[in-house]
């Protein structure tokens, strides 16, 4: 059973994303209703922290687990940022650029894999994932703690976008170096 726990944590992120989106669409402007999706998002963010660590600690890493972890992050961030855009907490252009980057790099990694090329995650890529989860938290917390300035969430979202494109550039340049 222990060998499935990391995969189940990634699956939790995948299945929590549409639930959070639904709750945001239900009434994402109601501060009281934001508590439930905020708690679910917080738990989901921690699953991202633990799934890989547990897989390595218990020596149950697998290709399926690595795939699920990567896809879970992309599904989670895509769903949540679409919801944030719908409730007008994040600009459309930020969501479009984040999602575009995710599709481009996922496609590139698939292409590289088909060619037998491995592009390991960079420090910027790992920081990007952390910043995206922090951004989700801060956007939601701004609804709960009105003493916080909205600019804190906006700055973290912007940093997540910047790190997304820096890590995207690293993936593309890593691929190009290996194909020349």
Predicted regions and their residues:
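Alpha-helical transmembrane bundles and membrane-interface segments of multipass inner-membrane proteins
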Residues: 1-180
